[in-house]
From Swiss-Prot:
<keyword id="KW-1048">Host nucleus</keyword>
<dbReference type="GO" id="GO:0003700">
    <property type="term" value="F:DNA-binding transcription factor activity"/>
</dbReference>
<feature type="region of interest" description="E7 terminal domain">
    <location>
        <begin position="1"/>
        <end position="47"/>
    </location>
</feature>
<protein>
    <recommendedName>
        <fullName>Protein E7</fullName>
    </recommendedName>
</protein>
<keyword id="KW-0479">Metal-binding</keyword>
<comment type="subunit">
    <text>Homodimer. Homooligomer. Interacts with host RB1; this interaction induces dissociation of RB1-E2F1 complex thereby disrupting RB1 activity. Interacts with host EP300; this interaction represses EP300 transcriptional activity. Interacts with protein E2; this interaction inhibits E7 oncogenic activity. Interacts with host TMEM173/STING; this interaction impairs the ability of TMEM173/STING to sense cytosolic DNA and promote the production of type I interferon (IFN-alpha and IFN-beta).</text>
</comment>
<keyword id="KW-0804">Transcription</keyword>
<keyword id="KW-1090">Inhibition of host innate immune response by virus</keyword>
<keyword id="KW-1114">Inhibition of host interferon signaling pathway by virus</keyword>
<keyword id="KW-0945">Host-virus interaction</keyword>
<feature type="short sequence motif" description="LXCXE motif; interaction with host RB1 and TMEM173/STING">
    <location>
        <begin position="26"/>
        <end position="30"/>
    </location>
</feature>
<dbReference type="GO" id="GO:0006351">
    <property type="term" value="P:DNA-templated transcription"/>
</dbReference>
<keyword id="KW-0922">Interferon antiviral system evasion</keyword>
<keyword id="KW-0899">Viral immunoevasion</keyword>
<keyword id="KW-0010">Activator</keyword>
<keyword id="KW-1035">Host cytoplasm</keyword>
<keyword id="KW-0862">Zinc</keyword>
Length: 110
């Protein structure tokens, strides 16, 4: 390309017909290092780690929930302690029928 703007005459396309399909070597010629460097965990260690994760899922953890008041739409922040399974049940209630009322709207309706 010569000049500030390309023109169709300046564009040169070179097309080569490729009728032959060249074979590709898919064999990996990579060599592995010594297996002494690798740390192989026995199955009981892996199972123990999975057991720890499952136990952690059942323990009570503190979670912060942000929602809005169903009357005035003010932001509410709740802190609950629940297991992951129970927190999931609370999330399902939020999506279904559970509504929260802020303290100001709660005192006005009484």
């Amino acid at each position: 390309m010569h000049g500030p703007k390309p023109t169709v005459q300046e564009i040169v396309l070179e097309l080569c017909p490729c009728n032959e399909i060249e074979p590709v070597d898919l064999v990996c010629h990579e060599q592995l290092g010594d297996s002494d460097d690798e740390i192989d965990e026995p199955d009981h260690a892996v199972n123990h780690h999975q057991h720890q994760l499952l136990a952690r899922r059942d323990e009570q953890q503190r979670h912060t929930i942000q929602c809005t008041c169903c009357k005035c739409n003010n932001l509410l922040q709740l802190v609950v302690e629940a297991s992951r399974e129970n927190l999931r049940n609370v999330e399902l209630l939020f999506m279904d029928s559970l509504n929260f009322v802020c303290p100001w709207c709660a005192t006005e309706t009484q």
